[in-house]
């Protein structure tokens, strides 16, 4: 799964570069998680997980605290999750996951983004069947066999464990992501660079330079949308 690891790193690096956009999107996600349960990460596991991911993305404490305080203060915005799927040039596929307080606005914006950037939006399920929802855990290490044994002993449903560039990369069934994190923490591993649910393409395509430029414009435009939280695709050379 080396290629998949490379794509995850590339996507994470690109997002980390646009810091203000990353902070704002995590702020929305933290607020939404806090509103759905208690605004206390110790009693709200969803909120705790989002905060951990925000810290991995270097989101400052004041941004996290502001989002939680807004939820505590009785903010009346309600956010709804969504997923939009579509196609780019030459067999390229893209999934955009959204979190929005205005679904009609988001649908209109996403449709327009596809249309203006050489893509075609599809129906629900049009491309997601070609992706596997996967738990991904990344941390420093060089002994994947040992990590696999730890997870196996904890009865975590693991798809793969690899070593990539001095990091251990664990791929789990989506339902076992939190179980895998807990097992690793129990084994003394406490620092993670990634703990995410990712949609990983079952197969990938390589685009020509011309098609790649079009597709990159589509992905960038989707990621620039304030309502879009994550973008997944199947292009190997992006």
UniProtKB/Swiss-Prot annotation:
Which Pfam families does the record associate with it? TACO1_YebC_N (PF20772), Transcrip_reg (PF01709)
Gene Ontology cellular-component terms for this entry are: cytosol
Q: What Gene3D superfamilies would the database entry show?
A: 1.10.10.200, 3.30.70.980
Which GO annotations describe the biological process of this protein? regulation of DNA-templated transcription
Keywords (A to Z) from UniProt: Cytoplasm, DNA-binding, Transcription, Transcription regulation
Subcellular location(s) per record: Cytoplasm
A GO MF label = DNA binding
UniProt-listed InterPro entries? Integrase-like_N, TACO1_YebC-like_2nd/3rd_dom, TACO1_YebC_N, Transcrip_reg_TACO1-like, Transcrip_reg_TACO1-like_dom3, Transcrip_reg_TACO1_YeeN, YebC-like
State the family named in the UniProt similarity comment for this chain: Belongs to the TACO1 family. YeeN subfamily.
Name of this protein? Probable transcriptional regulatory protein llmg_0242
| Originating organism | Lactococcus lactis subsp. cremoris (strain MG1363)
